[in-house]
């Protein structure tokens, strides 16, 4: 489908967006937004080097200055078929300048994400900008699965909507700049009506040490993808429905 779209609302230098487009079995238009203008410039260069004329990168704060608006109504955010994101973990000042620029992103969840932690704010932005049959994958700190207070209220609301297809727990110390364990939330709005549970994979033990970081081997990645795609539950310690 030549009109399919994928967005990364925290695109950094654009590598995740480029890989998503490379992995798509059909032509797809890419849209990225990056807060730092220098990094946004790098993303544009990266797109050119990878011969990706179909990628648009815009600079600006995704919360206070979202760049992609509905073409027919400038007061509504544009929605995408697919979203991929590895946003900055536990962002402290995400609320700066958002007054009057919420665009309904934080409504209907029973609470607002905490002022000093933007993890759920990213998730709400993604859910708002995903089409009603859209699919997304977002990397967030493991804490989003169990932290309390406002986040617990929001989490409960999201779970009740059956938008989350699966959660993949990753090893700690995988990403540069943080030792925090992360997880991938796989969102699929299309199948929500008939979804009974969430497919959980605990991939936190499948890795190899690489200097002072941990790294997923090809076989670890293959196991995650195969288990997820085929919904294999033969080893309940590794994967099961909850």
Predicted regions and their residues:
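Class I S-adenosyl-L-methionine
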Residues: 1-29, 39
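Beta-strand segments within the central parallel beta-sheet cores of soluble alpha/beta enzyme folds
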Residues: 4-11, 31, 57-59, 199-201
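Short, well-ordered alpha-helices that flank and scaffold nucleotide-derived cofactor binding pockets
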Residues: 18-25, 45-48, 128
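Short acidic, glycine/serine/threonine-rich loops at helix termini
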Residues: 19, 42-45, 68-71, 94-98
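Residues at the starts of beta-strands that form the adenosine-phosphate
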Residues: 27-31, 54, 135
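Conserved acidic E/D residue at the C-terminus of a beta-strand in Rossmann-like folds
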Residues: 34-35
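S-adenosyl-L-methionine
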Residues: 44-77
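A conserved structural/catalytic subdomain of Rossmann-like adenosyl-cofactor enzymes
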Residues: 71-242
């Amino acid at each position: 489908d030549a009109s399919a779209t994928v967005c990364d609302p925290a695109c950094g230098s654009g590598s995740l967006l480029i890989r998503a487009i490379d992995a798509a079995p059909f032509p797809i238009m890419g849209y990225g937004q990056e807060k730092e203008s220098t990094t946004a410039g790098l993303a544009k260069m990266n797109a050119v080097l990878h011969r990706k004329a179909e990628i648009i990168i815009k600079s600006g704060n995704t919360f206070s200055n979202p760049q992609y608006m509905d073409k027919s109504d400038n007061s509504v955010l544009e929605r995408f078929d697919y979203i991929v994101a590895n946003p900055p973990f536990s962002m402290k000042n995400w609320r700066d300048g958002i007054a009057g620029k919420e665009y309904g992103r934080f409504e209907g969840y029973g609470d607002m994400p905490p002022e000093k932690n933007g993890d759920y704010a990213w998730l709400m932005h993604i859910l708002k900008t995903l089409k009603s049959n859209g699919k997304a994958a977002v990397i967030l700190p493991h804490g989003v699965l169990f932290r309390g207070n406002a986040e617990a209220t929001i989490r409960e609301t999201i779970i009740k909507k059956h938008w989350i297809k699966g959660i993949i727990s990753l090893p700690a110390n995988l990403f540069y700049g943080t030792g925090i364990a992360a997880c991938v939330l796989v969102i699929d709005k299309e199948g929500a009506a008939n979804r009974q549970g969430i497919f959980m994979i605990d991939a936190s033990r499948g890795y190899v040490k690489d200097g002072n970081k941990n790294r997923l081997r090809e076989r670890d990645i293959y196991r995650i993808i195969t288990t997820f795609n085929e919904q294999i539950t033969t080893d309940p310690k590794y994967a099961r429905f909850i």
